[in-house]
């Protein structure tokens, strides 16, 4: 058992070691691929600089196997006459690059780089003179301005391998990742130059005419025909680069390459990671990649070990198919746009991140009713009847404004608003036609909802008077045709009813009547749409008549039936509200003898209220507010004139309310100094506590108002008065978080320390006190007591004092530095 456990532990350690080794190799491979990407970026910059040359570079010939270092290769005549640096190096011509060719120029590529760093494991690929054309030129890392087309990849020696056809010749080294499923670089022997770098494939855009010959040559080298003449992929790659990029387009491509390097830190690059190794770092270092849309469509077309597709596979067909797809813009924006896989100069048209113009106007109106309906449903229980602009006739929110639009369809109703609701029963015939007047709005949901509202019109038949009284309001509503109806009350939203309450006709009727009540008289309660509010029609008519008479609308001949029954109440209200009507002369001499009243009894029954007897005298009464209420409110708001008038009507300016708050408390909290001074001078009690024991000095201290504290102390405020809740003095109530705390706290602390020391220790009694023990002194309000000893070791709240030749203990919270001010006016 121990051996098995040891063996399992050893296997586990071996697995951990292998996993760590693999992670280390992956990190090294990531660094290697990053260096390769940097070299490729420099290569593309050099290619873009040389793309302005008058002639394309000619591909040199050479077998795939490693040839002698300076062996001449068979070059076709069209390319051999262009004076490529390789031919100049072979023939010893006088070209500027040909004189620098010697064997020592290849030494920097052998084990150490010019910077002293060891070269990568793929160094043998750099030793191929046919795969790297710049070995024959000078060691200057910067290309010459002339003869740019001669050597397209001439560059300074680099210790790190660059992507491209540099690895395409020679046998694979032991470090080639032939078995890595996620590596974008496949086997150099199993695949042609296209398998190594799918981004080097032909562009979906048509090539320029100047490069037709190199394109055909490159195509023949890909297909395997003419491999001896065009086997070196370097020239074919240069031709393809010149075909792919227009002149001076290297800035945008460099930006895209730089942007491609950033996502290399994330594990999932695109959707193609499903088919590749998840954590392969080389997946994310390709300078150009097809987007996820193209990758998913054609991954199985090639039997490549690379996770990306060649650029010449399915690019144009997918782009053409994608143009017809309306949703491709969003997908291309979501995948190809942010990753920047294609240079903007040769992007397909379908990848341009431009939103389509046709789906936009169709989608916007389709989404508008959704938020509006939800808002109406949350705010109003009857949103279904009034959410549309057509304003269906059964809506209780619109105060009879919609009928003029829908009533002209039936011919027997030429005037729908003059005598409004006797004509409402024919509305069910017009209900099926309600969707047709408003076809411009999506009203597909309203016809089934409108099957419920035809019930309320049957309830409205016996009450034409209500609509007669509201005719001017309705006509004014017809002029103002707002798209959305607002609740009549500006102070609240109408309460939302439960779904089952909308089908009850009584509740809909109550909601309609309440919506028609004038705004100043509308109730603010939350239960006004409850079933208990549904009163008989007579009461509602009576209420409407009362309102019309109160607003002096006497031209109400419309109400016909029950008017004699309701007129006594309305006339009594009118007599109290304003001047009497010209018709009734009888109520003017009320003090007349009783024998004159019987002949006028019939008229007085119509003129006088039923709540008052016929012979009762009328007195002119006016409302009189409580002076205490006026005093408290005016002291808080700072109205000195009102305070003075209220004090004249009161016997005690310190009269408190039910909470013990006096006008002096409110004036101090409102920082009204003039009112504070007036109340103190008028004899207000500066020590009047409220229900919590707060005196005016506590209020002033809590506001950090030193000026008011000084005024209160000088007029006999109790310095050591304590609150009932926490027993705190005024000094302890100073607010340290408000302005003026330091001054107020310092002043109150000095006053406390001065009590019994200033004025030869004289303090003044503010209340009467009767001694309970033999060692205590009794005193009355206003008497001066001399403090002999304070802060004794045994008593802290009691001082040893002398009064009238007697000594004893006195409570310190009964005294102040100054005597209390007496009232200076006679009581009313």
UniProtKB/Swiss-Prot annotation:
Q: Which residues form a coiled coil?
A: none
**Cellular component terms, GO, for this chain's entry?**
cell junction; cytosol; intercellular bridge; nucleoplasm; nucleus
Question: What is the predominant subcellular site recorded for this chain?
Answer: cytoplasm
Under Pfam families, the record lists: Ank_2 (PF12796), SH3_9 (PF14604)
| GO molecular function annotations of the record | cadherin binding; identical protein binding; transcription corepressor activity
Ranges where the SH3 domain occurs: 758-820
Q: Residue ranges of region Disordered?
A: 45-267, 286-371, 393-506, 520-619
Expressed, tissue-wise, as follows:
Highly expressed in heart, placenta and prostate. Weakly expressed in brain, liver, skeletal muscle, testis and peripheral blood leukocyte.
Function summary: Regulator that plays a central role in regulation of apoptosis and transcription via its interaction with NF-kappa-B and p53/TP53 proteins. Blocks transcription of HIV-1 virus by inhibiting the action of both NF-kappa-B and SP1. Also inhibits p53/TP53 function, possibly by preventing the association between p53/TP53 and ASPP1 or ASPP2, and therefore suppressing the subsequent activation of apoptosis. Is involved in NF-kappa-B dependent negative regulation of inflammatory response.
The record's comment on protein family reads: Belongs to the iASPP family.
Per the record, the domain comment is: The N-terminal region is required for cytoplasmic localization. The ANK repeats and the SH3 domain are required for specific interactions with p53/TP53.
Q: Which PANTHER family match?
A: RELA-ASSOCIATED INHIBITOR (PTHR24164:SF4)
- From the Swiss-Prot or TrEMBL record, give the protein name: RelA-associated inhibitor
């Amino acid at each position: 058992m121990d051996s098995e456990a040891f063996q399992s532990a050893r296997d586990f350690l071996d697995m951990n070691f292998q996993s760590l080794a693999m992670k280390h190799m992956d990190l090294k491979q990531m660094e290697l691929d990053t260096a390769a990407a940097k070299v490729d970026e420099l290569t593309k910059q050099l290619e873009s600089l040389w793309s302005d040359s008058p002639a394309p570079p000619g591909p040199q010939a050479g077998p795939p196997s490693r040839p002698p270092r300076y062996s001449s290769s068979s070059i076709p005549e069209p390319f051999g006459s262009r004076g490529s640096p390789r031919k100049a190096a072979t023939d010893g011509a006088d070209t500027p690059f040909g004189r620098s060719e010697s064997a020592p120029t290849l030494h920097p590529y052998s084990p150490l780089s010019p910077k002293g760093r060891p070269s990568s494991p793929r160094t043998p690929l750099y030793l191929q003179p046919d795969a790297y054309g710049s070995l024959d030129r000078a060691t200057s890392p910067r290309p010459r301005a002339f003869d740019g087309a001669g050597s397209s990849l001439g560059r300074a020696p680099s210790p790190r391998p660059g992507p491209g056809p540099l690895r395409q010749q020679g046998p694979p080294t032991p470090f080639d990742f032939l078995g890595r499923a996620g590596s974008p670089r496949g086997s150099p022997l199993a695949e042609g130059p296209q398998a190594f770098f799918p981004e080097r494939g032909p562009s979906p855009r048509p090539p320029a005419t100047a490069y037709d010959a190199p394109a055909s040559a490159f195509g023949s080298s890909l297909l395997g025909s003419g491999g001896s003449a065009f086997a070196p992929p370097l020239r074919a790659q240069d031709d393809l680069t010149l075909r792919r990029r227009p002149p001076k387009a290297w800035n945008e491509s460099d930006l895209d390459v730089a942007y491609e390097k950033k996502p290399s830190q994330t594990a999932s690059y695109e959707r193609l990671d499903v088919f590749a190794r998840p954590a392969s770092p080389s997946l994310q270092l390709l300078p150009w990649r097809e987007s996820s849309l193209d990758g998913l469509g054609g991954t199985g077309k090639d039997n490549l070990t690379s996770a990306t597709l060649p650029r010449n596979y399915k690019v144009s067909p997918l782009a053409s198919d994608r143009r017809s797809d309306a949703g491709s813009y969003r997908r291309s924006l979501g995948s190809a746009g942010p990753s920047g896989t294609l240079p903007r100069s040769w992007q397909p048209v379908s990848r341009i991140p431009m939103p389509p113009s046709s789906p936009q106007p169709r989608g916007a109106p389709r989404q508008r009713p959704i938020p509006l309906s939800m808002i109406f449903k949350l705010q109003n229980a009857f949103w279904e009847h009034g959410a549309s602009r057509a304003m269906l006739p059964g809506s209780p929110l619109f105060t009879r404004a919609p009928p003029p639009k829908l009533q002209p369809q039936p011919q027997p109703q030429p005037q729908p608003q003059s005598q409004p609701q006797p004509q409402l029963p024919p509305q069910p015939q017009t209900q099926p036609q309600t969707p047709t007047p408003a076809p411009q709005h999506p009203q597909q949901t309203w016809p089934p909802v409108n099957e419920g509202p035809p019930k309320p019109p049957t309830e409205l038949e016996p009450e034409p008077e209500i609509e007669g009284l509201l005719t001017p309001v309705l006509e004014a509503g017809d002029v103002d045709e707002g798209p959305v109806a607002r609740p009549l009350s500006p102070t609240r939203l109408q309460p939302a009813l439960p779904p089952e309450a909308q089908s009850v006709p009584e509740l809909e009727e109550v909601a309609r009547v309440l919506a028609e009540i004038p705004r100043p008289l509308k109730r603010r309660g939350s239960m006004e749409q409850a079933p208990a509010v549904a009163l008989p029609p007579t009461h509602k008519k009576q209420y409407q008549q009362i309102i019309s008479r109160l607003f002096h609308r006497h031209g109400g001949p419309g109400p016909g039936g029950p008017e004699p029954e309701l007129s006594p109440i309305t006339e009594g209200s009118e007599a109290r509200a304003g001047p009497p009507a010209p018709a009734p002369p009888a109520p003017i001499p009320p003090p007349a003898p009783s024998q004159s009243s019987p002949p006028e009894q019939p008229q007085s029954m119509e003129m006088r209220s039923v709540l008052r007897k016929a012979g009762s005298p009328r007195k002119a009464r006016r409302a009189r507010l409580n002076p205490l209420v006026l005093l408290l409110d005016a002291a808080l708001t700072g109205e000195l004139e009102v305070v003075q008038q209220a004090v004249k009507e009161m016997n005690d300016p310190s009269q408190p309310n039910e909470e013990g708050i006096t006008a002096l408390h409110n004036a101090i909290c409102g920082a009204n100094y003039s009112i504070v001074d007036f109340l103190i001078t008028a004899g207000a009690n500066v020590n009047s506590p409220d229900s919590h024991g707060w005196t005016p000095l506590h209020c002033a201290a809590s506001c950090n108002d030193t000026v008011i504290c000084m005024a209160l102390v000088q007029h006999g405020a109790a310095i050591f008065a304590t609150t009932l809740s926490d027993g705190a003095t005024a000094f302890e109530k100073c607010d340290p978080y408000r302005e003026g705390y330091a001054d107020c706290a310092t002043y109150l602390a000095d006053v406390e320390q001065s009590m019994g020391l200033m004025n030869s220790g004289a303090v003044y009694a503010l209340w009467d006190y009767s001694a309970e023990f033999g060692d205590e002194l009794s005193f009355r309000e206003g008497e001066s007591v001399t403090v002999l000893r304070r802060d004794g070791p045994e008593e802290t709240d009691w001082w040893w004092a002398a009064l009238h030749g007697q000594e004893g203990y006195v409570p310190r919270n009964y005294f102040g530095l100054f005597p209390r001010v007496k009232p200076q006016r006679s009581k009313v």
